[in-house]
């Protein structure tokens, strides 16, 4: 084989080898892309499986009656705290202007949420553009007192301090007034004013007078909304099932300052339970069988108002003079029964321990004239002269004795 032929064979083999490598590379790339696609698909499937489920928050309509009661209670607690803050802020008028505005807005918002019966939120009234001149429109909604003579419709419409009617006026833009027989609280005043000018409504049956001033197209919408809301209030509810009445009484307690915060009540209950447990443990320790005489000697402890109970010893007499310290007083007898346990115990009072123990140093001072107490000298006769020397306890001088000075 010639050199040229050998070169051609080598080139052909080299081309085949390169083609095989290229085909293998293409297959490897395809396999790699396929593996990546499979891995991405598996990752997406795992993410879909592990993705948290979207939990739709429970609206008040979906709450159970117990959950609705707890929600109403928490709203009332918050409203009571806001009103308390508002009263405290009234001591600084025109100082915290923005704080007062924000607090008033929050009180209005919380109060509106308090009166969302069955989770029904009242949407703001949508009014058309004003057209024409301003007119005054009114309508009467009669109260069914003949069908339900024992039901308090007036209190249900007005609410505590007239707050329900005021809120309805703000929502509808109408003026709401209770008129007719039985609309006044003072029956004597009502009878006296019946038939007088400007009191003609007392001759009519009990009704709700709704008045609005606006353009005709807007006044019609406002009046219809107010009539619908008043008619809802005129539907009597069974005793104990009137949610509006419960919330009105709750608001009245908040306004009067007699509302009991549930958080403070729970703290008081826990504190009372803690005091009861402490008293029970103390009584158990005092009545233990190993110390039969202790219950009779020590006074039963009372729970301290701000801390753990204290056991106070009876009032003790503390010696203040040397005579009381040196008085011969016997030690008190043992307070425990030594039979059975062999314990020797003499309960000395530490404040009077020196006198009870009979300290030998104190008794030694009592027997000598050079002790702690100095003897006082007394004159038997009066002095003839203020500067005259007096001799006490000195024997008389013998006759003929001459004193040399």
From Swiss-Prot:
It is found in: Nucleus. Its main location: nucleus. Residues 142-210 form the KH domain. GO terms for molecular function: mRNA 3'-UTR binding; mRNA 5'-UTR binding; mRNA binding. Disruption phenotype: Flies exhibit wing blisters and flight impairment. GO terms for cellular component: cytoplasm; nucleus. It holds the Pfam family STAR_dimer. During embryogenesis, expression is seen in mesodermal precursors of somatic, visceral and pharyngeal muscle. Later in embryogenesis, expression is restricted to heart and muscle attachment sites of the epidermis. During onset of metamorphosis, expression is seen in muscle and muscle attachment cells. It comes from the Eukaryota. One of its GO terms (biological process) is muscle organ development. PROSITE patterns: KH_TYPE_1. InterPro entries: BBP-like, KH_1_KHDC4/BBP-like, KH_dom, KH_dom_type_1_sf, STAR_dimer. Keywords: Developmental protein, Nucleus, RNA-binding. Induction: By 20-hydroxyecdysone at the onset of metamorphosis. Changing residue 106 to G: Abolished dimerization without affecting ability to regulate dosage compensation. RNA-binding protein involved in muscle development and dosage compensation. Vital role in steroid regulation of muscle development and to control heart rate. Required during embryogenesis, in late stages of somatic muscle development, for myotube migration and during metamorphosis for muscle reorganization. Required for integrin-mediated cell-adhesion in wing blade. Together with Sxl, acts as an inhibitor of dosage compensation in females by preventing production of msl-2 protein, an essential component of the MSL complex. Homodimer. Interacts with Sxl; promoting nuclear retention of msl-2 transcripts. PANTHER family: KH DOMAIN-CONTAINING RNA-BINDING PROTEIN QKI, RNA-BINDING PROTEIN RELATED. This is Protein held out wings. It comes from Drosophila melanogaster (Fruit fly). The gene is how.
């Amino acid at each position: 084989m010639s050199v040229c032929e050998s070169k051609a064979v080598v080139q052909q083999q080299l081309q085949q080898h390169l083609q095989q490598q290229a085909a293998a590379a293409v297959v490897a790339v395809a396999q790699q892309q396929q593996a990546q696609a499979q891995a991405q698909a598996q990752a997406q499937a795992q993410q879909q499986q592990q993705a948290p489920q979207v939990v739709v928050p429970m609206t008040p309509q979906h709450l159970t009656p117990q959950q609705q009661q707890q929600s109403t209670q928490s709203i009332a607690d918050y409203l009571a705290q806001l009103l308390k803050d508002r009263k405290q802020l009234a001591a600084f008028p025109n100082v915290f202007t923005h704080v007062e505005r924000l607090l008033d807005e929050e009180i209005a918002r919380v109060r509106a949420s308090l009166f969302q019966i069955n989770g029904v939120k009242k949407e703001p009234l949508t009014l058309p553009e004003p057209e024409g001149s301003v007119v005054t429109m009114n309508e009467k909604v009669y109260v069914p007192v003949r069908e339900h003579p024992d039901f308090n419709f007036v209190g249900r419409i007005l609410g505590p301090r007239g707050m329900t009617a005021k809120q309805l006026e703000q929502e509808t833009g109408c003026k709401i007034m209770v008129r007719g027989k039985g609309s006044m609280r003072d029956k004597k005043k009502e009878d006296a004013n019946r038939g007088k000018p400007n009191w003609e409504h007392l001759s009519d049956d009990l009704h709700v007078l709704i008045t609005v001033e606006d353009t005709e197209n807007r006044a019609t919408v406002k009046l219809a909304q107010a009539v619908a809301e008043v008619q809802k209030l005129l539907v009597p509810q069974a005793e104990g099932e009137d949610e509006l009445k419960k919330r009105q009484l709750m608001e009245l307690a908040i306004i009067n300052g007699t509302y009991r915060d549930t958080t403070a009540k729970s703290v008081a209950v826990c504190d009372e339970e803690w005091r009861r447990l402490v008293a029970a443990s103390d009584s158990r320790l005092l009545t233990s069988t190993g110390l039969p005489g202790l219950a009779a000697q020590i006074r039963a402890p009372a729970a301290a108002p701000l801390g753990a109970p204290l056991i106070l010893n009876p009032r003790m007499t503390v010696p203040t003079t040397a005579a009381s310290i040196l008085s011969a007083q016997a030690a008190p007898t043992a307070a425990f029964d030594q039979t059975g346990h062999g314990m020797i115990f003499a309960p000395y009072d530490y404040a009077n321990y020196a006198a009870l123990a009979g300290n030998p140093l104190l008794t030694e001072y009592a027997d000598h004239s050079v002790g702690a107490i100095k003897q006082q000298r007394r004159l038997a006769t009066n002095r003839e002269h203020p500067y005259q020397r007096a001799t006490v306890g000195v024997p008389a001088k013998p006759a003929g004795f001459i004193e040399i000075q």
